[in-house]
């Protein structure tokens, strides 16, 4: 166990403090597991969206998830890759931007798929 003596009074409050060395150690472990298992790890913005750390994450993880148009845009513009997007509900207004910012889109139902992507015969609009 590594213990650090940090004077937390030196930081403004509230703020987030990230220890880069430990983050990299954990990301290295995650990447090693993914490589050995032959899988891709996807960063979920719901649990972690500290966008200033995205350059570090990009060294270890290639993709992210999004559950809104804003997260999809964050994935493309700040993380640097299109998102794997899932949302229980999409709007006609947001869907073109979701498509622009996403590499994968998961629908909640066949009705939702047909509403946004199908011409009614299962073919893409």
Predicted feature descriptions by range:
Residues 39-125:
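Active-site-proximal beta-alpha core segment in soluble small-molecule metabolic enzymes
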Residues 27:
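Short amphipathic alpha-helical/adjacent loop interface patches that line ligand
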Residues 3-4, 22, 71:
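Active-site anion-handling motifs in enzyme catalytic cores
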Residues 3-18:
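Generic N-terminal amphipathic, Lys/Arg-enriched alpha-helix
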